[in-house]
Amino acid sequence: MLQLKFIWPVARITPIYRPFTSHPFRNLATSSSISSTKAKTTKTDTTPLKLSNELYAIFKIHNRPYLVTEGDRVILPFKLKQAEVGDILNMTDVTTLGSRNYKLVGHPINTSLYTLKATVVGKTKRAFQTREVTKRRNRRVRHAKSKGDLTILRISELSMN
């Protein structure tokens, strides 16, 4: 007769619960240790970026990165409910600012170093799409129709302060 022996697991996996934010997940152990000790802030020299006339920025909306320059058009695959057409948005979740030869990286970068403004050009919908949904071993075909929301932004200002 075969006997089964129960073995206790060596490591237990506990789920991590967190609210939805546009910021990446930060480990609580490292963030509390940083806040308990005095954090040294270093003054970065941003004059090469200030003198550059070709700047780019990577900003995040709903944790999706978008790489833009001044005058670009950004198509967001969702509807921004708070913004109306013609509104000017200040982008604050910028992770990278750079030019052809220099780059400033932070998560996120301090908003006093830059100005990134976008104008809401339009709110529209995608083209009407129909896809066939079937199940195995079943002749029935269901047609799923979708028409997703889009928000179109124009980057109106990108500069270093």
From Swiss-Prot:
Transit peptide: 1-35
Keyword Transit peptide appears in the UniProt entry: yes
UniProt keyword list: Mitochondrion, Ribonucleoprotein, Ribosomal protein, Transit peptide
SUPFAM superfamilies reported for this sequence: L21p-like
A GO term for molecular function: structural constituent of ribosome
Chief location of this protein within or outside the cell: mitochondrion
Key word Ribonucleoprotein present: yes
Single Gene Ontology BP annotation: mitochondrial translation
GO cellular component assignments: mitochondrial inner membrane; mitochondrial large ribosomal subunit; mitochondrion
Subcellular location: Mitochondrion
Further comment found in the protein's record: Present with 1850 molecules/cell in log phase SD medium.
Family per record: Belongs to the bacterial ribosomal protein bL21 family.
Assembly, per entry: Component of the mitochondrial large ribosomal subunit (mt-LSU). Mature yeast 74S mitochondrial ribosomes consist of a small (37S) and a large (54S) subunit. The 37S small subunit contains a 15S ribosomal RNA (15S mt-rRNA) and 34 different proteins. The 54S large subunit contains a 21S rRNA (21S mt-rRNA) and 46 different proteins.
Function per UniProt: Component of the mitochondrial ribosome (mitoribosome), a dedicated translation machinery responsible for the synthesis of mitochondrial genome-encoded proteins, including at least some of the essential transmembrane subunits of the mitochondrial respiratory chain. The mitoribosomes are attached to the mitochondrial inner membrane and translation products are cotranslationally integrated into the membrane.
Name of the protein: Large ribosomal subunit protein bL21m
Name of the gene: MRPL49
